[in-house]
Regions:
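Acidic, histidine-bearing metal-coordination/catalytic regions of metal-dependent phosphoesterases
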Residues: 2, 8, 18-159, 178-179, ...
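Extended active-site neighborhood of metal-dependent phosphoesterases/phosphodiesterases
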Residues: 54, 116-146, 199-301, 325-337, ...
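Short, well-ordered beta-to-alpha junction loops that form the rim of enzyme active sites
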Residues: 120-121, 263, 310-314, 342
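Conserved, compact domain cores that house catalytic/ligand-binding motifs in diverse enzymes
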Residues: 153-231
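Active-site neighborhood of phospho(di)ester-bond hydrolases with catalytic His/Asp-centered motifs
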Residues: 158-161, 184-190, 217-225, 308-312, ...
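Soluble non-cytosolic domains of exported or imported proteins
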Residues: 164-168, 278-285, 320-321
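Short acidic, glycine-rich surface-loop motifs adjacent to enzyme active sites
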Residues: 192, 295-318
Length: 401
């Protein structure tokens, strides 16, 4: 009996050691730290591009390229003049982003030059800590863009507004835009009724805009009051922020200096409908300081032949009763034109009607504004969805000092 117990103990110990060795080998096979160059697995799984590419916030030396995929993927952009001999691989805190929304900034471009580009995304099947499982790569067709350049003699652009999730409206307006070549398109806000999901942002705005702009015409976006509303409104900037991470910015193209303002909400923060979740008072106060600085101190405001301000609300939005000071600042800077939306019907507010020394153009929902600027004049035409002329006028260059 005694020897049987000893034999049983020895057998149990051997079994335990054997199982431990097997487990150790299994762990070693799972995480072979001694050979990090063992190839990762690649599966026959290719993502599809579901939106884009869309060119956003063009400048003279940079541009944002956005697209979306139907499955988690990485993203990169190849670009160049004549051949795709440069590549941008984005990083966030040292890691390549993985997801379905892809946003890459191409920097270091030359002003007024035309580039070709192509986006690519590789499927990430399983984002494991070691040897992530990868899939195959999808590439877009090759598109092109031309950077802004202050040395250009002329610039042409179109403006639309308040599309409010109406895909058919976007399709009709962008089709109308392309009847005459333009360098870029401005959307002055309220692309959605309120922001609730990524699919809504994609399906009701980004995808139809990207399709309509044909991967060649850049979009400049101005935030509207409806863009403040909904559970995803706080993430809306992930899709439409300018390059510096905000909604207020300036851009220059040819004889044109552009000032993009965020006119905020149309009611005070304390209005019950907001439940105390807005703080436009502080936000607009900071924006007011920025606006004064841009108009008074930014050299191009005085040097450019024409300065155009873009905003959603033609009365500057809710600014705690200080609408007059915004108009006065614009008057002092001798801006040439303010283009807005918000009212859903066309208005041409002429100088002097509301204390303004400049015309205010309020674009209707189903209209396209075409603007062409040269060193001496700025011509404006407004057409409806049928292409019928609604209004037309010309502004002559005026002294800025």
């Amino acid at each position: 009996m005694k020897w049987n117990k000893v034999l049983f103990t020895v057998m149990a110990l051997c079994t335990s050691l054997l199982l431990g060795a097997v487990a150790a080998e299994a762990r070693k096979a799972a995480v072979p730290d001694d050979d990090p160059n063992v190839p990762y697995r690649t599966f026959d799984s290719t993502p599809a591009i579901t939106m884009g590419p869309l060119l956003l916030d063009m400048s003279d030396t940079s541009v944002i390229v956005e697209w979306m995929t139907d499955a988690p993927s990485d993203g990169r952009v190849s670009y160049g003049e004549g051949k795709l001999d440069h590549e941008v691989v984005p990083q966030m805190d040292g890691m390549v982003p993985v997801g379905t929304m892809h946003r890459v900034v191409i920097e270091g471009l030359a002003p007024g030059r035309t580039y070709q580009y192509c986006v690519a995304s590789r499927r990430v099947v399983a984002l494991k800590p070691y040897w992530p499982d990868m899939g195959k790569t999808v590439e877009s067709a090759v598109g092109s863009f031309t950077t802004f350049g202050a040395a250009k003699k002329t610039t042409r652009f179109a403006v639309i507004t308040d599309t409010h999730e109406n895909v058919e409206r976007i399709q009709a307006l962008t089709s109308l835009i392309h009847q005459v070549p333009v360098d870029f398109v401005v959307h002055t806000g309220d692309s959605l009724n309120y922001v609730v999901s990524e699919n809504q942002i994609k399906d009701r705005f980004l995808e139809p805009m990207a399709t309509g702009l044909k991967a060649t015409t850049p979009l400049l976006y101005v935030r509207g009051n409806h863009d403040y509303r909904g559970e995803m409104a706080r993430s809306f900037g992930d899709y439409l922020h300018a390059q510096d991470g905000g909604y207020v910015y300036t851009r220059d193209d040819g004889p044109l200096h552009m000032v993009m303002v965020d006119t905020g909400e149309d009611k005070p923060d304390g209005t019950q409908v907001y439940a105390g979740l807005n703080n436009l008072r502080d936000y607009r106060t900071r924006e007011w300081a920025w606006f004064r600085h841009v108009l008074a101190d930014e050299p191009r405001t005085k040097a450019a032949p024409f300065t155009v301000v873009f905003g959603h609300d033609p009365s500057w939005g809710w600014v705690d009763g200080q609408e007059t000071q915004w108009t006065q600042a614009a008057n002092q800077a001798r801006i040439d034109l303010f283009i807005a939306g918000h009212e859903h019907h066309y208005q041409h507010i002429k100088p002097g009607e509301h204390g303004n020394d400049f015309p205010v153009l309020v674009v209707g929902q189903d209209q396209v504004v075409r603007v062409e600027a040269s060193d001496t004049e700025l011509t404006v035409k407004v057409v409806d969805r049928a292409g019928k002329l609604v209004d037309a006028f010309t502004l002559r260059r005026k002294p800025k000092s």
